[in-house]
């Protein structure tokens, strides 16, 4: 590729270059000096070397500041060093996907990145133009899907890369996306889409294994064809596999593993025991390597997943049983060992353990163990004389055993693929399909064998197809831009393909020929190969080997060792093995080994060339790919240690060469690799020809003039781009750097002059200041000397005065101390004499007190003893009286119990009377009389109870009086005892009995308190009984009132019928019965009829037949329906900001008493009418109109309806009937502002339906607004390209951005103004306007923020200024709309505001992570901040993003965040919820009074609603009726 670049001889000191390095592939360097043919450069490691210019590549100085480009074609210098560095920079920032034109490069991150692959991310890429969002495997998948739909042509996606590069995961992601966009909305686990997805883990279990480089390496090639119908839905699928590595079944090396399915089966628990399996270490086919477990993978769980995948794909339980029986048989077969037999060159089973495993294998295969042993130890040869049995030595028997194991596993794998294809099913009517190819990449190891030869042959084929496609894309680009491209050529690899596959002397043909001869060896094969291709440029013979050969592939030279070529190419099938297993009693085993034709059984061996078969499969694959439009995904493994964030440059560079990425770059370099839009070219290189910038606004003409002035000829001008040959952009950058250097020198010269002048002025001013300061210091020093002398004299005077005063004060204080001591001694003596005198007096007083107190206590104890004897006597007397009172209280409780039972009986009878009141009015009147009699009897009993209670109270009063008398007597006795001093001898006896009397007294007091408590309880129960009796009396009165109300209502109805004109009555009576209405209408008559007692309307009911009455009801119902339908269909407008339709409908329902009906017909008509009205007309006008009306009607129902109960319903109806007679308006329709209406279940159900209708209307308005807003927001996220005349004025870095918003933001403002005007014209409550505007701004925030994170061209400084100016306009709009309508809309823009604020802030590199998270972007998550920081680039001032230390800290936090189970996507989710409930609407919308609103004029045309209009006449009529 380097030969395609011209020698860049114009390098000069200071230029940035790339230097080849043996450890890092390429390393950054700076040119220090240039000599004749050498350049002196200094690398980034500090090493200084001399290098030839042709071995250097230019390096873009902006690469260090930017975080790489998402498309390699945008690189300033397109070469392998730039490609490698760009991938490394992006990989360090977790940007694992990069484009090279239409080719996607995917670098394996070796860690989970769930935020890149969730459903929300799929929705973002669905339908997005290619290249508009960040590179992603979903973007390639979407391009293929859209191309298939738009062009009606099949597509293919080719995924390649070396083992461990992530091909399998990438393929699964592609299939996952295709099933997402092409799947059906179904929950069926057996859908085609689900089966296609589940085929991946199933094939991984049987076709993937751990290798040295990869823990989940695919050991086969896979091509999945996903078929689509005409609607773009998946209709079928087919899987083709290539070159399964059969030898891995019997032979593995450490640290590799066998296929995953074996380890899963050993860890399956009960199933493993059933098949006599144990630890994998016990089986020869698994213990050849010491690796049995994979880190972070549970074989038991994977076994369950495999079983689940089998169920979804459609493999029955019997077939699953057969699959795992076969796997277990293979493991047991591997443990069968052989030893030499008695005969020469014969073999037998080695030991009993081998015999056991042989028997287990035979049991699992369901065949005879002896026949199985014979097929392993002998071989049958068919000759003319007959069949000859040949014994095999132990080595040959082991080979036969391994051949059987490989054959069984290969048949099992083929059956599994075929079963998946049959289960998923292929659509024969499918017009197009998308094929996903997951095949091994180019391999070059230290030792390369037959597998590497086949793999590299396949990659040569695919590379040829890839080169043709890339060259075709280049041609399409040139043709689209209308430039000349006919002379561009590219290198083809057809010669190496001919060397490999051409007949009759290609490598494959010679290999097959050698395999057909038993005595051929790899030496003879190599010799014949060199004899035929001695002078071929693509074939070389190594110096130190006679049998190896080297092929020059497109990715480099590979040396193959031919020792095992012949054995691996021979695919022998032993007929005895096939015959044995085809006759198995196990249907599954016999099914995977169909019976062979008779002619094929004549030989014990059937030879088949692996290379020839692979060549045919590859040819069929290429034919399929040639019929499709290809898309390429190149997977790259960044390091050999499988660790994240480690990038091995040499390994990646080798993979880029092997994957054809650098070949695509080379093809691009052969033409015009550098392409720039005219506007970008003029913006960057316009300073090279400033004299042309103001002449014309034609950017193409300006580009041509700039290139002509510089004398460049290797360019072509397309329609929208300028195309430059390789190296030309370097010349332009060099010239630009020279101009910038000259300008910089001029600026520096002027700046130095200015700085020197400023320094001189500053120095002169400083000198003057210093002189003035020195003079001031001298003057201040002289003044300070004089002031100090005067101060010293003053200090001396004050010191002398202070010393004299101190001596005088000391003398005075000494005299005072002497005087005070003398006075204190005399005072203390006097005080001691007074203290002794007082103590003597106090002792005398206490002695006298003690003497008198002892006498008093003796006398007092005697008195108390006498009192206790007397109280004992009185207490006994009182106890006898209290016992009598207690007996009387027991009788009272018995009477109370009987009374309670009678009350309960009364309550039961009252309930019975309520239930039976509907049987007839006569029965009710008789029951009322009975109840009155019962009430009188209960009243008498109540009076008796009251008298008993009064008597008991009187008795209690008498007892209290007696207690008072006894207390008085006690006091008298106490007075008498004061004079009984002579009774001292009886004190001892009284003291002994005092304690017992006190105890008895306490017992009696407790019994007295209990008696009082019982009396109080009895009184309380009597009061409750009285209350119940009053309630019964009230209910009886209500029944009487109801009866009178019903009679009054019947009279009113009678008078109404009498008012009817005689002509009308005659007309009704004269109609025939045949004119009755349909029964369906009769069913609805109960909607508006109020049931009336039949005995009051019998005279008139006899005059009208039942059919006539039903017809009148049906006609009235039809009229009601017509009125409601007209109110719904016509736009009635608003009256005083109140919706007329809602008020009229509510008043009609109230007047017709529809809320009390058991029918839902009228409510269904209203709901259906509203839904029909929403479907027709202009949605912008209809939806707000009905949002206003439906919410108003809902509020009226919410505030005035309440649920009905059984006991209150009758009372409420009778109350309304009576009130209707008294009030004229109530007769024809209750007042809207009246108390709550008792609603039945249909009315409550109607309220719920209306609530759902309001939510539906709100959701439709919101969704329509989002649909209108989405295309406007798509153009607002990125600043538009300014015209040349305007842009020329602000091209300098110091240019001030325009503050006025562009037309795109003006369209947003117009949209918001239109929204507000529509809502306010239809008088939508401010509550709904506030919610709608808030959700609209939330959607603006979501759309702008997600677009910012997915499009790198939007994360620029100038674009941030542009979006910020637009957001400021939105802020003005919110301020003008006021909080009543805007609500918290400004806070909904927090995410985009903070993101844009981060883009436009200066000196990002000085910001710490805490400052960014806490001050700049407190709302954003660490993942979102990391995404913006890594995608940001300054297109205006060229400043850098945050520092690398901050990026590293962010990466650590993002990795920790990845380990959480919660959603960790950096994109925002759209909130589709309804942000209110019926209660919120009721609280937010002001009170609405429908009675104050005059209905429309057409309402008077309907007789059923005339009462709503003609209120005065109705009032007068009601007065006459009364």
From Swiss-Prot:
Positions of the UniProt region annotated as Actin-binding: 499-533, 535-558, 593-618, 618-640
Keyword tRNA-binding: no
Subcellular localization(s) per the UniProt record: Cytoplasm; Nucleus membrane
A Gene Ontology molecular function term of the record: actin binding
Keyword Membrane: yes
Superkingdom per UniProt: Eukaryota
Domain Dilute intervals: 1164-1456
GO biological process: actin filament organization; actin filament-based movement; nuclear migration; regulation of establishment or maintenance of cell polarity regulating cell shape
Cellular compartments per GO CC: cytoplasm; myosin complex; nuclear membrane
Segment forming the signal sequence: none
Domain Myosin N-terminal SH3-like: start-end pairs: 12-61
Record domain IQ: where: 763-792, 788-817, 811-840, 836-865, 859-888
Phenotype when the gene is knocked out: Impaired nuclear movement. Abnormal nucleus shape with invaginated envelope.
InterPro entries the UniProt entry points to: Dilute_dom, IQ_motif_EF-hand-BS, Kinesin_motor_dom_sf, Myosin_head_motor_dom-like, Myosin_N, MyosinXI_CBD, MYSc_Myo11, P-loop_NTPase
CDD domains reported in the protein's UniProt record: IQCD, MyosinXI_CBD, MYSc_Myo11
PROSITE patterns in alphabetical order: DILUTE, IQ, MYOSIN_MOTOR, SH3_LIKE
Coiled coil: 889-1059
Amino-acid positions noted as binding ATP in the UniProt annotation, renumbered to this chain: 161-168, 214-222
Residue intervals of the Myosin motor domain: 67-737
Keyword list, A-Z: Actin-binding, ATP-binding, Calmodulin-binding, Coiled coil, Cytoplasm, Membrane, Motor protein, Myosin, Nucleotide-binding, Nucleus, Repeat
Function, as annotated: Myosin heavy chain that is required for the cell cycle-regulated transport of various organelles and proteins for their segregation. Functions by binding with its tail domain to receptor proteins on organelles and exerting force with its N-terminal motor domain against actin filaments, thereby transporting its cargo along polarized actin cables. Involved in trafficking of Golgi stacks and mitochondria. Plays a role in nuclear shape determination. Drives nuclear movement along actin filaments.
Family (UniProt): Belongs to the TRAFAC class myosin-kinesin ATPase superfamily. Myosin family. Plant myosin class XI subfamily.
Domain-related comment: IQ domain mediates interaction with calmodulin.
UniProt subunit comment: Homodimer. Interacts with MYOB1 and MYOB7. Interacts with WIT1 and WIT2. Core component of the LINC complex which is composed of inner nuclear membrane SUN domain-containing proteins coupled to outer nuclear membrane WIP and WIT proteins. The LINC complex also involves nucleoskeletal proteins CRWN/LINC and possibly KAKU4 and the cytoskeletal myosin KAKU1.
Protein name: Myosin-15
Source species of the chain: Arabidopsis thaliana (Mouse-ear cress)
């Amino acid at each position: 590729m380097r030969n395609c670049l011209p020698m860049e001889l114009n390098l000069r000191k200071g230029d940035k270059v790339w230097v080849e390095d043996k450890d890092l592939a390429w390393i950054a360097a700076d040119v220090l000096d240039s000599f004749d043919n050498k350049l002196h450069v200094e690398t980034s490691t500090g090493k200084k070397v001399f290098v030839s210019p042709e071995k250097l590549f230019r390096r873009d100085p902006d690469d260090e500041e930017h975080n790489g480009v998402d498309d390699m074609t945008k690189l300033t210098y397109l070469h392998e060093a730039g490609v490698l560095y760009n991938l490394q920079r992006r990989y360090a920032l977790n940007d694992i996907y990069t484009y090279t034109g239409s080719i996607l490069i995917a670098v394996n991150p070796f860690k989970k990145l769930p935020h890149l692959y969730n459903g929300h991310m799929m929705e973002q890429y669905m339908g997005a133009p290619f290249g508009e969002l960040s590179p992603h495997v979903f973007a390639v998948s979407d391009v293929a899907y859209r191309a298939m739909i738009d062009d009606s042509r099949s597509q293919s996606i080719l995924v390649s890369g070396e083992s461990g590069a992530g091909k399998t995961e990438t393929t699964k992601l592609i299939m996952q996306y295709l099933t997402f966009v092409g799947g059906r909305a179904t929950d069926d686990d057996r859908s085609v889409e689900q089966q296609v997805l589940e085929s991946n883990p199933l094939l991984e279990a049987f076709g993937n294994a751990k290798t040295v480089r990869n823990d989940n390496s695919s050991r086969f090639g896979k091509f999945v064809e996903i078929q689509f119908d005409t609607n773009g839905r998946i209709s079928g699928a087919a899987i083709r596999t290539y070159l399964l590595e059969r030898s891995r079944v019997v032979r593995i090396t450490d640290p590799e593993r066998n296929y995953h399915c074996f380890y899963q089966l050993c860890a399956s628990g009960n199933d493993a025991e059933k098949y006599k399996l144990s630890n994998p270490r016990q089986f020869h086919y698994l213990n050849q390597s010491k690796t049995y477990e994979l880190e972070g993978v549970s074989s038991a769980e994977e076994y369950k997943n495999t079983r689940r995948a089998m169920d979804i794909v459609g493999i029955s339980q019997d077939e699953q049983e057969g699959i795992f029986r076969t796997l277990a048989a293979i493991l047991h077969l591997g443990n069968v060992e052989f030893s030499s037999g008695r005969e020469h060159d014969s073999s037998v089973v080695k030991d009993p353990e081998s015999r056991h495993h042989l028997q287990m294998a035979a049991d699992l295969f369901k065949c005879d163990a002896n026949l199985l042993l014979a097929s392993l130890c002998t071989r049958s040869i068919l000759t003319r004389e007959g069949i000859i049995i040949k014994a095999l030595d132990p080595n040959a028997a082991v080979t036969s055993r391994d051949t059987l194991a490989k054959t069984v596993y290969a048949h099992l794998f083929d059956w599994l693929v075929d079963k998946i294809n049959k289960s998923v099913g292929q659509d024969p009517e499918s017009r197009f399909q998308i094929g996903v190819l997951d095949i091994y990449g180019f391999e070059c190891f230290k030792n390369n064998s037959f597998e590497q030869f086949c793999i590299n042959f396949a990659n040569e084929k695919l590379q040829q197809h890839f080169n043709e496609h890339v060259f075709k894309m280049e041609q399409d680009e040139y043709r689209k831009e209308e430039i000349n491209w006919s002379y561009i050529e590219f290198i083809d690899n057809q010669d190496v393909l001919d060397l490999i596959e051409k007949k009759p002397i290609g490598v494959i043909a010679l290999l097959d020929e050698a395999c057909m001869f038993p005595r051929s060896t790899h030496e003879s094969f190599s010799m014949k190969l060199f004899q035929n291709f001695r002078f071929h440029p693509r074939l070389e013979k190594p110096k130190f080997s006679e049998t190896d050969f080297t092929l020059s592939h497109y990715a480099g030279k590979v040396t193959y060792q031919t020792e095992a070529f012949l054995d691996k190419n021979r695919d022998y099938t032993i007929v005895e093995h096939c015959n044995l297993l085809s006759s198995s009693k196990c249907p599954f085993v016999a099914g995977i080994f169909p019976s062979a034709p008779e002619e094929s059984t004549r030989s014990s061996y059937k030879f088949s060339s692996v290379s020839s078969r692979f060549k045919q499969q590859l040819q069929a694959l290429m034919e399929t790919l040639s019929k499709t439009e290809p898309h390429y995904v190149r997977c790259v493994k960044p390091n050999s240690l499988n660790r994240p964030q480690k990038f091995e440059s040499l390994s990646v560079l080798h993979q880029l060469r092997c994957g054809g990425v650098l070949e695509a770059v080379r093809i691009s370099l052969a033409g015009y690799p550098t392409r720039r839009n005219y506007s970008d070219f003029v913006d960057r290189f316009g300073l090279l020809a400033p004299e042309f910038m103001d002449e014309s606004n034609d950017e193409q003409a300006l580009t041509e003039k700039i290139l002509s002035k510089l004398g460049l000829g290797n360019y072509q001008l397309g329609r929208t781009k300028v195309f430059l040959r390789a190296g030309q952009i370097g010349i332009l950058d060099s010239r630009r750097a020279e101009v910038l250097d000259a300008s910089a020198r001029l600026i520096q010269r002027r700046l130095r002059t200015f700085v020197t002048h400023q320094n001189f002025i500053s120095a002169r001013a400083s000198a003057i200041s210093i002189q003035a300061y020195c003079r001031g210091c001298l003057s201040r020093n002289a003044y300070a000397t004089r002031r100090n002398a005067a101060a010293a004299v003053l200090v001396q005077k004050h010191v002398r005065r202070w010393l004299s005063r101190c001596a005088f004060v000391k003398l005075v204080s000494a005299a005072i101390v002497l005087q005070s001591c003398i006075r204190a001694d005399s005072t203390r003596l006097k005080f001691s004499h007074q203290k002794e005198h007082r103590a003597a007096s106090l002792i005398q007083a206490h002695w006298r007190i003690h003497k008198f107190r002892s006498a008093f206590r003796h006398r007092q104890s005697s008195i108390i003893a006498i009192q206790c004897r007397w109280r004992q006597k009185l207490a006994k007397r009182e106890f006898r009286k209290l016992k009598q009172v207690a007996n009387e209280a027991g009788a009272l409780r018995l009477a109370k119990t009987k009374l309670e039972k009678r009350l309960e009986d009364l309550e039961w009878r009252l309930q019975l009377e309520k239930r039976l009141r509907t049987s007839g009015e006569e029965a009710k009147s008789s029951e009322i009389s009975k109840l009155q009699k019962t009430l009188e009897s209960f009243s008498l009993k109540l009076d008796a109870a009251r008298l008993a209670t009064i008597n008991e109270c009187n008795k209690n009063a008498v007892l209290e009086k007696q207690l008072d008398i006894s207390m008085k007597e006690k006091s008298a006795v106490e007075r008498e005892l004061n004079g009984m001093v002579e009774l001292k001898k009886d004190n001892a006896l009284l003291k002994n009995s005092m304690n017992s009397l006190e105890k008895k007294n306490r017992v009696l007091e407790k019994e007295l308190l209990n008696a009082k408590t019982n009396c109080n309880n009895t009184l309380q129960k009597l009061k409750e009984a009285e209350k119940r009796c009053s309630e019964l009396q009230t209910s009886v009165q209500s029944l009487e009132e109801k009866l009178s109300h019903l009679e009054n209502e019947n009279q009113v109805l009678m008078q109404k019928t009498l008012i009817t004109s005689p002509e009308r009555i005659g007309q009704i009576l004269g109609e025939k019965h045949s004119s009755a209405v349909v029964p369906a209408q009769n069913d609805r008559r109960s909607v508006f009829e109020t049931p009336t007692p039949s005995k009051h309307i019998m005279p008139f009911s006899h005059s009208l037949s039942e059919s006539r009455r039903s017809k009148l009801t049906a006609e009235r119902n039809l009229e009601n329906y017509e009125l409601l339908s007209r109110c719904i269909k016509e736009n009635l407008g608003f009256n005083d900001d109140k919706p007329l339709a809602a008020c009229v409908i509510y008043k009609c329902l109230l007047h017709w008493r529809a809320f009390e009906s058991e029918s839902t017909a009228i409510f269904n008509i209203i709901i259906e009418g509203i839904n029909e009205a929403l479907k027709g007309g202009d949605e912008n006008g209809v939806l707000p109109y009905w949002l206003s009306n439906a919410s108003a009607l809902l509020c009226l129902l919410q505030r005035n309806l309440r649920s009905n109960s059984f006991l209150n319903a009758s009372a409420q109806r009778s109350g309304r009937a009576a009130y209707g007679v008294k009030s004229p308006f109530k007769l024809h329709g209750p007042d809207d502002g009246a108390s709550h209406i008792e609603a039945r279940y249909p009315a409550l159900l109607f309220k719920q339906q209306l609530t759902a209708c309001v939510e539906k209307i709100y959701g439709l308005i919101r969704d329509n607004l989002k649909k209108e807003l989405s295309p406007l927001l798509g153009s607002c996220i990125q600043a538009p390209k300014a015209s040349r005349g305007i842009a020329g004025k602000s091209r300098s870095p110091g240019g001030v951005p325009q503050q006025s918003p562009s037309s795109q933001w003006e369209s947003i403002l117009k949209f918001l103004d239109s929204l507000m005007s529509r809502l306010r014209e239809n008088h939508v409550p401010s509550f709904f306007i506030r919610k709608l505007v808030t959700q609209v701004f939330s959607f603006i925030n979501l759309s702008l923020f997600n677009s910012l994170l997915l499009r790198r061209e939007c994360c620029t400084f100038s674009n941030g200024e542009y979006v910020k100016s637009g957001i400021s306009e939105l802020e003005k709009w919110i301020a003008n709309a006021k909080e009543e309508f805007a609500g918290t809309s400004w806070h909904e823009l927090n995410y985009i505001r903070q993101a844009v604020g981060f883009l436009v802030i200066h000196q990002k590199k000085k910001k710490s992570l805490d400052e960014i998270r806490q001050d700049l972007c407190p709302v954003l998550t660490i993942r979102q901040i990391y995404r913006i920081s890594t995608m940001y680039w300054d297109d205006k001032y060229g400043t850098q993003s945050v520092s690398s230390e901050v990026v590293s800290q962010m990466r650590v936090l993002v990795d920790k965040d990845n380990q959480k189970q919660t959603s960790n996507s950096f994109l925002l989710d759209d909130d589709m919820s309804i942000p209110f409930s019926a209660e919120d609407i009721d609280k937010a919308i002001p009170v609405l009074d429908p009675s104050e609103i005059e209905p429309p004029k057409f309402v008077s045309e309907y007789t059923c609603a005339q009462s709503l209009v003609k209120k005065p006449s109705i009032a007068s009529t009601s007065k006459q009726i009364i």
